[in-house]
């Protein structure tokens, strides 16, 4: 059975560009050998990045993480300070946080707790959907129950947020698995992360090396760079995930291992480029989309349906009668520009379709040359006989 031949008949570049999962250079070479991978990748992002933005820009979790300044500023500060994996105080977990709850509401409520050391909102996506949790780390001698009672008193009960103590005993700093052959990929990922967060690569490596207190440490090794990824960006080279807090990384990497899905994430991130090439529509282009040309000298407003004899008249109408809609368009353009400058590994996983470990089904038969794929319908029909 010629599996590759049957796939080639069904898959073209237009099919691939419509998918919600990016494929690797090797996979594209097996499916469409003459297709430029760079052209495919650029055009995939041109479609997919605005699509993810349009689907999420009104959602509170998205606003908190990518459009408000607080989260981004706090993360940049933490990166420059180099993360520590020492946790002394007890921990509380907040469950059942709807994605409609503004991050500012959560921030305001938990920040009032005098026993608070720090907290963060954890965002998770998977094939089962989107979820939010909040981990609250208290000061060393704090009373957990008193802290829970206080936070319950300041939270709106209608939100339905559940608070309980979370046991972190036995959680330790993760060990990153790497070998000498991983240096180039790890270094490329570190460079990508520096570009992503607008961090000077040389300066942050110098600061990290200084924080180690060991000037003899060899920086041109995979071990050094993989640990720098961990301590600077909370990025695990083994499972190829970035985390928002050291405790989250400690829990997420307890039983981690390298997988085909992790290798895909590493490959995409190692060649990551900024999205300055994306087309950001202007206000005039957006208004043109709201103009219907019925025929010559007949223009129709997409907001209210009113007709005009010329473009000049309809644009005057937009400015005079649809100020709110124009402000909304201008705000949308501003927010999209913010978003493409703040794309991180979390939303990159959504964009590239690597936020779960499923490999795209349409390339599965071609991943390994020695894999045998059977058409089970044909097997059971008797068309194919499997000998012993």
Curated annotation (Swiss-Prot):
Gene Ontology molecular function: any one: zinc ion binding
Keywords: Metal-binding, Zinc, Zinc-finger
Keyword presence, Iron: no
Entries under InterPro entries matching the protein: Znf_C2H2_type
Zinc-finger ranges (C2H2-type): 299-322
Protein name: Zinc finger C2H2 protein ECU10_0150
Organism: Encephalitozoon cuniculi (strain GB-M1)
